[in-house]
Structure formats: structure tokens, C-alpha cells
């Protein structure tokens, strides 16, 4: 707001990202019957609980998927970019077959190696912490969440997130992971936007920018409108 005002423009409206995200991702039925929307970002995880079409609870937990990346970098003694690449390509939030994963060798920089089991062990520990924090915010209202829990954001794209969350809450709650884009987004053939949930926030904000705030009027038009 300060930046916009400093540029001598007026703020038309301030949008709250969790609200715009809920409007673009959740169906009317989900909001009405009760659900939890969990936006797993890089540095924060936002939990929004809806019931009877009203946002009942909004909590931001200061931990996200980047923490798992930093754990990988620290434990395997590699660069953060390499750690992120390994997490995206091979990472799992829950590794059931640990013995089998141990035999899958992953190449690291400077001629070093690790195995998929070790990588996922690091990721699983951090995701367990994140999901425990999520469940701590949801548990009290869990019986009211008829439409279950909806995950979105870049951190929610990791494999086996469903299984990891079930290990945390020990309940048979309906879980949906948003991977596509909002239905109202239209693109040209030359425009590429990753269809993986990582852009959900910015796209939801764009969908709410439905007013032309840069219409130029001549002095004559301004006088005619008075």
C-alpha cells in the first residue's frame, strides 16, 4: 500500500490471499458443508476453515516446504538449489518401503552419492512436523469438516502427502490435493503457466482483479461525467 501511494496512485482494494484462494479453489458445496483449505507454501503454511459459507478460522504457521529443502542441504552437505531439485524429483512425504528405497542410488555433486531412502527420511521428518501443526489447528473442528481437507500450494505437490497426513491424524478424512489451475483462467497458446498448484495464489488474485483501474479520461470526458 505504501509503494502504491508513493507512486501517486490510489489503492482500489486490498485483497486477502487466503480469501481469494478459497473463492477460486473451493466449491460452494465445500464451503457450505465445511472444509479446511491448507496452503503449503515455501515459508509458511496457511490453514483456512470454512463452515456454512463463512471463514471460521484462519491460521498461518511459520513453517513450509523450504524448511525441508534446507534440511536436505544441511544433512547431505549440498547446495540449496541441488537440494530443491532432489526434493522435487525424488521426494516423498511418506516412505513406506524404506528398504527398497535404500537400493535406489542418487548422484550428488562432486561425485558423491546418497540413496532415495535417506533423502525421503529427511523430508518425511520435516513434513511430519508441518502436518502435525496443521492437524493441531484442524482437530478441534474436524467433525464439522464434511467435505474434508483440501491441500494446495507448491509444498502440497510432493508425492505421498495423502499417506503422510493419514499417519498424523489417524482418521479416515477425505483429502483432496489441488494440482490444476482455477477453471476461470484462460490462456493464449503462447502462454505457459505450470499446472502444478504452485501458482494458485497469484492466479486467485488475478481472478479478483476484474475492474479496469487504468481507464484514462480526457478533461472533456471528466467534465461531462460531473
Task: Tell where the protein language model's regions lie, with residue ranges.
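Short, ordered loop/turn segments at secondary-structure junctions
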Residues: 16-20, 61, 88, 178-185
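Phosphate-binding glycine-rich/basic clefts of nucleotide- and phosphate-handling proteins
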Residues: 1-2, 9, 19, 51-127, ...
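Short, solvent-exposed amphipathic alpha-helical segments in soluble enzyme
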Residues: 30-31, 164-171
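Glycine-rich phosphate-binding/hydrolytic loop that grips phosphoryl groups
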Residues: 178-225
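Residue-level signature of catalytic and energy-coupling elements of molecular machines
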Residues: 4, 39, 72, 134, ...
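Phosphate/pyrophosphate-binding loops at sites that engage ATP/ADP/AMP, CoA/4′-phosphopantetheine
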Residues: 131, 135-148
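Gly/Thr-rich phosphate-binding beta-strand-loop-beta motif of the actin/hexokinase/Hsp70
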Residues: 28-57, 72
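Nucleotide/phosphate-binding catalytic cleft detector across ATP-hydrolyzing
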Residues: 1-35, 93-109, 113-119, 141, ...
